Amino acid sequence: PHLLERYQPSLVIIEMGANDGLRGHAPRAIKSNLSTMIQACLSNGAAIALIEMDIPANYGSAYRDAFRSIYRELSDQFDIILIPSVFDEIFGNPQLLQADGLHPNQKAQILIKERVLSTLSKTLQGL
């Protein structure tokens, strides 16, 4: 919070929660943590763009669905920008992953950047 007060950003892009999901944390705890971050940003006057995260399908459909729903629910709850996940494209392509088979590589970062910029530019044009 002190950095928000110090720098007073007009826009904060939040990309968080994937590691918590990969560790099997309860979706409600992940949602609560993200909600706290969003509230801190909003209370300091910043607009929020939340990047939808995903986890691999081998975590099971029930957990994965609960995890994935967090981002839409928070977007609706706080009326913030939701940037759709690009991770389905990344997880399905080994050429876009680091050697660990989990983290996006440099090529994937370009896709993520393009998705973020595309969504933000469309949203800002609509204002």
Where are these regions (language model features)?
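Alpha-helical cap/lid subdomain in secreted, periplasmic
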Residues: 1-127
